[in-house]
């Protein structure tokens, strides 16, 4: 048996009669994790714009994003013609076939076994945790499939579906980030994984220049450092006038306490 594993890969702009991006057949096993499939096209009469899954093959897609793939017939994104397919923590959105961006043009099961869980799939699909809700990409038209604040993909995946040892997303950034602005709706213990190839990263904390030692609070240690540098320059020169003076002391006292 052939086992192929793809992680943090992008499949873009490919075209073929049967499988726009990747074809699995025989007794092969293919796994995709943190991958992006976009603008792939199947031109034949029974193709899948992104994936074609043949008899006896097994395909697993986890935390991957499928957008803007197309087919001239059947499934614009994934077609399973007799294999076993498992799709978890993924996003399938805006893939088109003859009928437009319908559920059948996101994923068509034709004689195979398909399980979809904790996935955003346009048009909906039966399975635990699945959603039919706009994933709110940063810029779908510009192929930026990172997640906007408030995306339904944030903290809504299943931690148990993430392959063991996976610690980063497509960008190589931390895979498990808890967004305090979003109620956890996925499966597992916080932090809950996001759906799709990109984990929503938290914005950096606001600058706190008076926190000279980086402890997260302006406190006595910072005051001591400022007084030790009095009359000179350096990090304690908070207003950048070249001199640690009363103005810098006033700024520090005004910022006293935890950095927020």
Where are these regions (language model features)?
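Residue-level detector of buried hydrophobic side-chain packing
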Residues: 90, 119, 153, 172, ...
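Short aromatic/basic micro-patch
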Residues: 60, 146-148, 194, 217, ...
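Predominantly extracellular beta-rich ligand-binding scaffolds that present long acidic/polar faces
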Residues: 1-150, 162-163, 185
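C-terminal accessory segments
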Residues: 129-199
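Phosphate/oxyanion-binding loops and surfaces in catalytic or ligand/nucleic-acid-binding neighborhoods
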Residues: 93, 122-124, 156-160, 198, ...
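Generic detector of well-ordered alpha-helical packing
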Residues: 106, 140, 156, 170, ...
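Extracellular/surface recognition and adhesion modules
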Residues: 14, 137, 172, 212-215
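Cellulosome-associated attachment modules in secreted, modular CAZymes
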Residues: 200-260
